[in-house]
Swiss-Prot record:
Gene3D superfamilies: 3-hydroxy-3-methylglutaryl-coenzyme A Reductase, Chain A, domain 2, HMGR, N-terminal domain, Hydroxymethylglutaryl-CoA reductase, class I/II, NAD/NADP-binding domain. The gene is hmgcr. It is an enzyme of class 1 (oxidoreductase). GO terms for cellular component: endoplasmic reticulum; endoplasmic reticulum membrane; peroxisomal membrane. Pfam families: HMG-CoA_red, Sterol-sensing. It comes from the Eukaryota. It is found in: Endoplasmic reticulum membrane; Peroxisome membrane. Residues 40-56, 115-123, 188-191, 277-316 are lumenal. The chain crosses the membrane at residues 10-39, 57-78, 90-114, 124-149, 160-187, 192-220, 250-276, 317-341. InterPro entries: HMG_CoA_Rdtase (IPR002202), HMG_CoA_Rdtase_cat_sf (IPR023074), HMG_CoA_Rdtase_CS (IPR023076), HMG_CoA_Rdtase_eu_arc (IPR004554), HMG_CoA_Rdtase_metazoan (IPR004816), HMG_CoA_Rdtase_N (IPR023282), HMG_CoA_Rdtase_NAD(P)-bd_sf (IPR009023), HMG_CoA_Rdtase_sub-bd_dom_sf (IPR009029). It comes from Xenopus laevis. It catalyses: (R)-mevalonate + 2 NADP(+) + CoA = (3S)-3-hydroxy-3-methylglutaryl-CoA + 2 NADPH + 2 H(+). Its EC number is 1.1.1.34. This is 3-hydroxy-3-methylglutaryl-coenzyme A reductase. Residues 1-9, 79-89, 150-159, 221-249, 342-883 are cytoplasmic.
């Protein structure tokens, strides 16, 4: 209930920052000027002689006071240094200054409004500074700065207020009650200082609850600049702040003790102020005459001012003692160091840690002013460029942006780096291009001229030809004779048709070999999608270590899999075997009658029919060899499932081609047979199917490992008994209750998809490839060790063809030593990759099941997998176990 009230308060303050700030300032000014209506113009030392107790100030007191002031200034300095660690010094610094200033002004106004004596301000100021605690303000600012957008700032401030508000309220109450005890001491100086302390605590609390969140909300609302799709002031993600506050959450026992202590202090104050004082007054035996005389002596007496008021204040400001000079000097020195020197160090550190390499700035160059040269010359430039020169150019591209092209000279450069230095021969082959687009007829003649072509046209002219249908949009790469230039023009054409013209600015397209994409991977290309690639390992499989690449945007996945790999490594490694190898294609054919379909099925099931079809099947490819035919009849439809090895290729295209040849041979035997589709979903490809789970498709693999009890306890933070129990009730009973097909596992699809994307596989085939059953059993002499196995009957995978031809994907395959076709045995690399996938799935299963058994799943994903909040440097469960 209390948190809900504070949340509502935080939402209101963050939603109305101007109103709250103006209201706070107005209230402060009103309280400051309220005593002006009393007509009291008394100013001690100027027009009034105010009697006070003259006491000799000891040198030891001066030294102690000076040390106290210096400590207070250093304390404030270190408070702001802690704010700097958040990475946003200016926003938090300004907000912190606002907090300190408003707290000080409010304290002064309250005390002045209550007509209290201000002579103790000099002594109380250090204690006032020492009572300022910016940790709560810093924590609230973290909530605001963890927002992904402007709209989330208010909600996150409200959440932060709901978490921090009750704790801060209790702490402020306890501080006031504890410090307030000093106001009952009877020692005048101590009473004044404690009064200031209470006012300071209340002022800080008031500013924290009203002024500070409003300022933070307003500052972030006015900061519209963004970087890489997120606000430039964003520090981390919201889950990191939640995790940090969860770890720093006060002990409930301590909170109860504070509440009990507060209640006790309230009773002490009530007894001292309302019960003890009357009795003590009654016990005094001072006569009325003595009291009157004492009061007359202490009353201020009016005198004639000896100087103007402004001169009086100026003299008070100029007159400084030695201890005040020392204090002021230290404050100025630390201020200069903080503002000037540490600013440079911070900016340098952040620029080294987070270099902003924005392809957007490079791409802002007008495409019309881009110039081109012959593709042969482009290749010459890149071939002749040394590795050192390339490294130097890339470094320069990070430090400074590319200059805008101002000349229409044909000088087409591929990549985000600075333009490479051209050889004299290349420069001599350049040609001038017109700045204004030429007529359409002239552009058509240049395009059709065999000696010229599209490279003699500007981008604007090419776009006009595409709009006039003289150049098909899908042929831009081939017509331009430079795939990257075709992609750039397509991006410009598409940008004009999008709701937001700058939508493609953050989608990169440079530094990519599109010649490998054309006709193989993608059409109508507008760029490429960078995906983070992590590594899990080492994975000890069949006595060989592997570093497994995983491309994913799901936090905690790689770290969790890495923990499983470590557990397998400490257990002696995993063993794996390929049970079967055969890609399938299941066409559907139609016969005149169901009896005819049954007759064809019987012929295919016979040895004679199988031999005829196999001869036709095998004659088409040097890799494809028909291993099995599986047939079924539905009415007059006949479904034939061809199963064949396909070497190191995944094999869908290969087996589709040979299936057509086999069907043509079948039609020769049965002329009435009509082929409806070469794929009749009897394969089955990219769809859940029991036939893949039972009969297998692609590579059928099994792997196993034994995890010692010590590793289960120390690395997986669980027990064998708990893991076996969760596996039975989750993976077996739970999947059966859900009617799952091949889903008797925890998250095999996670690992399969991540490896598939990294290694250039067909990501959609994770549907069938993720079929897996995970078995866990207690083993060992005392049945405390864990036996785990994963059986995956339909891993559709290959190391040649498709996305495996792209350089980044080839790099990931090379990490595993399975890139390309095997030079020893056809299909060896693909089978090895399938075993790696199965073993990595087992590692992921092991770690996730342990997290579930130990109850760590939610906490780890709060840290690593919260999209609205995309945490850093926090002790999350998965990284803690993987370390």
């Amino acid at each position: 209930m209390l948190s809900r009230l504070f949340r509502m308060h935080g939402q209101f303050v963050a939603s109305h920052p101007w109103e709250v700030i103006v209201g706070t300032v107005t209230l402060t000014i009103c309280m400051m000027s309220m005593n002006m209506f009393t007509g009291n113009d008394k100013i001690c030392g100027w027009n009034y002689a105010c009697p006070k107790f003259e006491e000799d100030v000891l040198s030891s007191d001066i030294i102690i006071l000076t040390i106290t002031r210096c400590i207070a200034i250093l304390y404030i300095y270190f408070q702001f240094q802690n704010l700097r660690q958040l990475g946003s010094k200016y926003i938090l610094g300004i907000a912190g200054l606002f907090t300190i200033f408003s707290s000080f002004v409010f304290s002064t106004v309250v005390i002045h409004f209550l007509d209290k004596e201000l002579t103790g301000l000099n002594e109380a100021l250090p204690f006032f500074l020492l009572l300022i605690d910016l940790s709560k303000a810093s924590a609230l600012a973290k909530f605001a700065l963890s927002s992904n957008s402007q709209d989330e700032v208010r909600d996150n401030i409200a959440r932060g207020m709901a978490i921090l508000g009750p704790t801060f309220t209790l702490e402020a109450l306890v501080e006031c009650l504890v410090i307030g005890v000093g106001t009952m001491s009877g020692v005048r100086q101590l009473e004044i200082m404690c009064c200031f302390g209470c006012m300071s605590v209340l002022a800080n609390y008031f500013a924290f609850m009203t002024f500070f969140p409003a300022c933070v909300s307003l500052v972030l609302e006015l900061s519209r600049e963004s970087r890489e799709g997120r606000p430039i002031w964003q520090l981390s993600q919201f889950a990191s702040v939640l995790e940090e506050e969860e770890d720093n959450k006060p002990n409930p026992v301590t909170q109860r003790v504070k509440m009990i202590m507060s209640l006790g202090l309230v009773l002490v104050h009530a007894h001292s102020r309302w019960i003890s004082e009357p009795s003590s007054q009654n016990s005094t035996s001072i006569s009325d005459h003595e009291v009157t005389t004492m009061l007359d002596d202490m009353m201020p007496k009016r005198v004639e001012p000896s100087m103007p008021l402004w001169q009086f204040y100026l003299s008070r400001m100029v007159t400084m003692d030695v201890e005040q000079i020392i204090t002021l000097g230290l404050a100025l020195l630390l201020a200069v160091k903080y503002i000037f020197f540490e600013q440079t160090e911070t900016e340098s550190t952040f620029s080294m840690k987070n270099p902003i390499i924005s392809p957007v700035a490079v791409q802002k160059k007008q495409i019309e002013s881009c110039c081109r040269r012959e593709p042969e010359q482009e290749k010459t430039v890149h071939v002749s460029t040394t590795e050192e020169a390339s490294s130097k150019e890339e470094t320069e591209a990070v430090i400074k942006p590319l200059p805008l092209e101002t000349s229409p000279k044909a000088k087409f450069i591929v990549g985000d780096s600075s333009p490479l230095e051209l050889s004299p021969e290349d420069k001599n082959t350049m040609f001038d291009l017109p700045e204004e687009p030429r007529p359409l007829d002239e552009c058509v003649r240049i395009l059709k001229n065999p000696d010229k072509g599209a490279q003699y046209l500007t981008d604007a002219e090419v776009i006009s030809l595409v709009n006039a249908k003289h150049i098909p949009a899908y042929k831009l790469e081939t017509m331009m004779e430079s795939p990257r230039e075709g992609v750039a023009i397509r991006r410009q054409m598409l940008s004009d048709k999008l709701p937001q013209r700058s939508a493609l600015q953050s989608l990169p397209y440079k530094n990519y070999n599109y010649s490998l994409v054309m006709g193989a991977c993608c059409e109508n290309v507008i760029g490429y999608m960078p995906i983070p690639v992590g590594v899990a390992g080492p994975l000890l499989l069949n006595n060989k270590e592997y570093q497994v690449p995983m491309a994913t945007t799901e936090g905690c996945l790689v770290a969790s899999t890495n923990r499983g790999c470590r557990a397998i490594m400490l257990g002696g490694g995993a063993k794996s075997r390929v049970l079967a190898d055969g890609m399938t294609r299941g066409p559907v054919v139609r016969l005149p009658t169901a009896c005819d379909a049954a007759e064809v099925k019987a012929w295919l099931d016979s040895a004679e029919g199988f031999k005829v079809i196999k001869d036709a099947f095998d004659s088409t490819s040097r890799f494809a060899r028909l291993g099995r035919l599986q047939n079924c009849v539905a009415g007059r439809n006949l479904y034939i499932r061809f199963q064949s090895k396909t070497g190191d290729a995944m094999g869908m295209n290969m087996i589709s081609k040979v299936t057509e040849q086999a069907l043509a041979r079948l039609q020769e035997e049965f002329p009435d047979l009509h082929v409806l589709a070469v794929s009749g979903n009897y394969c089955t490809d990219k769809k859940p199917a029991a036939i893949n789970w039972i009969e297998g498709r692609g590579k059928s693999v099994v792997c196993e490992a034994i995890i010692p009890a010590k590793v289960v306890r120390e690395v997986l933070k669980s027990s064998t008994e708990a893991l076996v129990e969760v596996n039975i009730n989750k993976n077996f009973i739970g999947s059966a209750m859900a009617g799952s097909i091949g889903g008797y596992n925890a998250h095999a699809a996670n690992i399969v998809t991540a490896i598939y994307i990294a290694c250039g596989q067909d990501a959609a085939q994770n549907v069938g490839s993720s079929n897996c059953i995970t078995i866990m059993e207690a083993t060992g002499p005392t049945y405390e060790d864990l036996y785990i196995s994963c059986t995956m009957p339909s891993i559709e995978i290959g190391t040649v063809g498709g996305g495996t031809n792209l350089a980044p994907q080839q790099a990931c395959l090379q990490m595993l030593g399975v890139q390309g076709a095997s030079t020893e045995t056809p299909g060896k690399n693909a089978c090895q990759l399938a075993q790696i996938v199965c073993s990595t799935v087992m590692a992921g299963e092991l770690s996730l099941m342990a997290a579930l058994a130990a109850g760590h799943l939610v906490k780890s994903h709060m840290v690593h997998n919260r999209s609205k909040i995309n945490l850093q440097d926090l002790p999350g469960t998965c990284t803690k176990k993987a370390a």
